[in-house]
Every structure is written in structure tokens, then in C-alpha cells.
Amino acid sequence: MNLRRVIREHLKKLKADFGVVAVKAEFEAEGSRKDELIMLRELVEPAGLGLVIKIGGCEAVHDIDQCKLLDATGIMAPMVETPFAVKKFHNAIDKIYGENSKNIEKIINAETITCYKNFDEILVEGKGFLTGITVGRSDLSASMGIERKHIEEQEVFDVTENFCKKAKKAGLVANFGGNIGVESIPFIMKISPHIDRFETRKVILTKSDDPDFLKKAIVYALEFELLYLRLKSEYYTNMATEDSQRIIRLEKQINSVKQ
């Protein structure tokens, strides 16, 4: 099976049938390597999908430079909690992109209760620069002292909803993610009037309030992630074993001389 071909077709179907707008990668928690990002870029481009990359910090200039080289369509700054962090992100983007920054999405990850408390000021600082926010429920719930198993419950919903309402009022694209699975469907349907998108770990989807559609879309998005992980595993396994026969021959050759 040609995994790359299978993945390309899978991505085309995600876009055509399920309203997927982009695929995600991370320099941050996921720690994507450059060769992985090049591989991902080669997979998403034929499908006509965007590539959104989460950088390692609000002013991770090296990561932003890599995003530019990879022709990322969006850059996300993680763990933004203050207006000053937005300013740092803005300055870093301007340093690398200059006038061309208008061609990419500039997104912040709203993922702590501290960010929530400072969100009005964050929006003021980001006016004219930011294009969207993504509420990260996993870290958000942890910062609220809520266990991950309760991520779908009302307390997390209320904060996520308020984040998204304020973002949309400010003219930004509102998105949320964090441990998204089929069990998240009631949460997605309930918050649908206040969001534009939602995301799994690897896929950004257009919102819907149709439970059957959402179930198919989420499962198909998770299947893409599984296929991609298999491709990564295959790639690194091949790298790890490509010299194994040469190693065996050299060991035999050296040992025969020593004897």
C-alpha cells in the first residue's frame, strides 16, 4: 500500500465531504521535525488544504521563519496569556514576514484561565493584527483545576463559549479544540452558534450542528491522524534500519581481523 497516495486521497475527501480547511502541525507540544513538516506540506498541497503551524512560543522567530519557508497558511502562538505576549507575537511576525503577513492567519491559543481573565485587553492589543483564536480545552481545563475526564462539562463549556463570543464580536475567527472525539458532539452542537471551526489534534474543520455529519467528520479526521502516524513510523523505521546490513558487514569484517 502506498501510504502517501492513500493519505492524499483521504485529505481530498476530508475537504470535499467534510469541510476541512486546514491540517495542523506543531513545533510546540508535538515537536514536529522539519522533515516531517516538509512531508506534511507535500501531502496537504495537492488536496488544496491550508497548513497551520503552532510555534514554540509567542516570539519563536526561528519557528516563524520555518513557517515562512514551508509556506504555512496560518501561524498559531501558544499559551498567550497577556496583551504583552500578543505584542511580542506581532513583532516576531513582522520581523519575518513584513508586509506579507497579511497573507497568513495569525492565531493565538487561548488555553488558560489567566488568558480568560485578560482576554478583553488581549483583544484590544491584537486589533488589526490577529485573525483568529483557538480555545485549547485540555490546558484550559487543567488551568481551572478540572480533570480531563470532565472536559465536556458545563464549567469548561461556559469559559469556551465566552472566549468564542468575544472573539467573534471582535471580528476574529473562533475555533476550539482539545481532546475532540465523538463524545464531543453535544459540546460542538451547543457551541455551534458562537464558533466558525473546531479541530482535532491534526485537522481543522468547519462547524456543523448535524450530529450524524459530525460523527463521520470526526472519525474521518482521526483516521487521517492514524494514517499520518503510520507514515511517520514507516519513515523513521526505514531511516533506522537502512544501514543495518552495512553495520553487520562491518562488524564481521572488523571482528575477523581482530581474531
Language-model features, listed with the residues they occupy:
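Expand to "…catalyze enediolate/carbanion chemistry for C-C bond making/breaking, isomerization
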Residues: 1-259
